[in-house]
Every structure is written in C-alpha cells, then in structure tokens.
Design a protein with these regions (language model features):
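Residue-level detector of short coil/turn "hinge" positions at structural boundaries
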Residues: 31-32, 91-92, 247, 268
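Short, solvent-exposed polar/charged micro-motifs at secondary-structure junctions
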Residues: 1, 47, 103-108, 137-138, ...
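Terminal peptide-recognition signature
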Residues: 3, 13, 24, 84, ...
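Short, basic/aromatic recognition patches
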Residues: 89-108
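A short mid-domain helix/strand-loop element embedded in enzyme catalytic domains
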Residues: 50-63, 71-82, 86-95, 118-135, ...
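Phosphate-handling DNA/RNA-contact segment within nucleic-acid enzymes
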Residues: 105-209
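TOPRIM fold recognition
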Residues: 11-14, 170-173, 179-280
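Non-catalytic accessory segments of DNA primases and related replication-initiation nucleases
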Residues: 1-86, 222
Length: 280
C-alpha cells in the first residue's frame, strides 16, 4: 500500500516498508546505478556520462620516476662522478642524468646513474640505470645497465629520436649509442652529444630544428658492423628528411668505441655527407 505522504513515495507491505526508490530497487532486481540511469532517462535527464580514464601502470611509473629524479643529487662530487672519472670522463652531463645513492636490486642496495630518455615530443620514454658499487660497475653476474619502459608499447613503437639529452641542443649536435661514449665524444670534440642508448634508437633519430651539422659517433663493432650500419642508416634518413641540416659526419675509431679511444688512444675515420640543396 502506497502512503501519499511527503511526496517520497512512501509504502508499506507485509514484506517491509520504505520510500519509492527502495520499492523500485526491490521490484526491479537491478543495481542501484542502473536504476538511477533509467529514471534519469524517463524524466528527461539524459546526459552524456564521461568515463574517468583508468591510470595505466606506465603513467603511474612515469610519475614516480619523475618525482624521484627531482629529488636526486647532481653527479658532481658523488661516486657516480668517480665512476665516470675512472673511465677518463671529466666533462659531466649538464642534464638528464643524476646520482641515486640507494638503488635496490635483487635484495641488495647499490648506487646508480639515473638517466631519463625522451623523444622528439619531449615525452619521457625510458629510465636508463647503470648500477654501481662505489666507483665501479656493480658485479651482478649480468649487465649492470637497466632500461625500463615508461610508456605503453603502442606509443614506444612509434616514438622517434629517443635519447638521453645530456646537453642543450646546438647547431652542431652529436649522437652516440652509450652514455660513456657520448660523454667521451663531448670531451674530445667539445660537441654537445646525446646518447641514443642503442643502435635501434640511433636508426630512428632525427635532428631537431636548428641543427645544421649532425655528427654521429659510431661504435666500431668489429664482428658485426652494427654501429656503423646504424650510423649510416641514421645519416641517410636525416639527409632525406625535411630539416635545417647542411651536412652529416660519421666518425668511428679503428677499435671499439670513443670511450676506449679516450682511455687508450686510437685513429678515427670520418665520412662527410652534404645535403642536396633544394632547387629554387
């Protein structure tokens, strides 16, 4: 029996009592949110419902990495700088790399070079870590270098110019694969040099606006030619692309890479390519 009191649809029955909303909920056997949606539609409150996006694990990790990076100390005066010094590197990066004094790994605590790799849109794509034990690479039975994805795979598959941008962009810009190689090239040639991390990212690197001369510091890779192949593919793509480039130089040592050259000395070879001028 419905009791017309207070306009709330009050009712009473042998099974209980309540207001109108409770009656509808009991008789329709539907979740409360579905009932509210149907009632809204019946009385004309039909509006667009916007779903709040679920934060992805990559987004969450990216925020944590950026927050941590902002709290880390600069390299100078740390065992991270001492490690680079032991590799002959005294010209330290201006940006993108900091020192983490407590880097956990497999239940142990190390230190690390904590490096951020971004793409040509400025989006953070990867966290690169070099695990250290004092002023030496950590002896963990495998590579002391770690690369962690900070974007979804469907974004990373199409990301271009991923690099650890350790120095400001300049009209003459260098790229190399590894951090130590890039810092060695910077120290030897006084060229702002970025680390593309590996040969795959080097192939996809395209110069930003304003770069007139790209210098690619290639690894020798005597048994595979991987470094030189990536350097030449990068050079070709940049020469064919629409940009401000005037020339591309490819440098490589007779052995190993430019950090080995810095420490032990070596001969360096060079190829120079000039961009074809557009016909007016």
């Amino acid at each position: 029996r419905v009791l017309f009191r207070s306009g709330a649809g009050t009712w009473i029955c042998v099974c209980g009592s309540g207001d109108g909303m409770k009656l509808v909920t009991l008789t329709q056997a539907k979740p409360f949110n579905e009932i509210c949606t149907e009632i809204d539609r019946l009385i004309g409150n039909d509006y667009q419902r916007v779903k709040i996006p679920v934060t992805s694990s990559a987004t969450s990790l990216r925020k944590r990495v950026l927050s941590k990076f902002s709290k880390l100390e600069a390299l100078r005066g740390t065992s991270g700088a001492a490690y680079l010094n032991s590799r002959g590197i005294f010209s330290l990066p201006a940006e993108a790399i900091r020192f983490n004094a407590r880097q956990r790994h497999n239940g142990s605590v190390f230190q690390s070079l904590y490096s951020l790799a971004t793409d040509d849109k400025g989006e953070l794509c990867y966290l690169h870590q070099t695990l250290l034990d004092g002023d030496k690479k950590a002896d963990i039975g495998s590579s002391a270098k770690r690369l962690k994805s900070l974007q979804e795979d469907n974004y990373l598959d199409h990301a271009r110019s991923v690099a650890i941008r350790m120095f400001p962009v300049a009209s003459t810009l260098g790229i190399a694969e590894g951090i130590e190689t890039a810092l060695s090239a910077h120290q030897i040639y006084n060229v702002n040099t970025w680390a593309t991390i590996n040969s795959g990212f080097m192939k996809k690197f395209r110069v930003p606006a304003g770069v007139l001369h790209l210098i690619i510091f290639a690894d020798r890779d005597e048994n595979s030619a991987t470094g030189l192949a990536a350097a030449c593919e990068c050079a070709h793509a940049n020469l064919m692309a629409k940009n401000d480039l005037q020339r591309v130089s490819v440098y490589w040592p007779d052995h190993d890479d430019f950090n080995n050259m810095l420490m032990n000395g070596d001969q360096v070879r060079e190829l120079v390519f000039h961009k074809k001028k557009a016909v007016a």
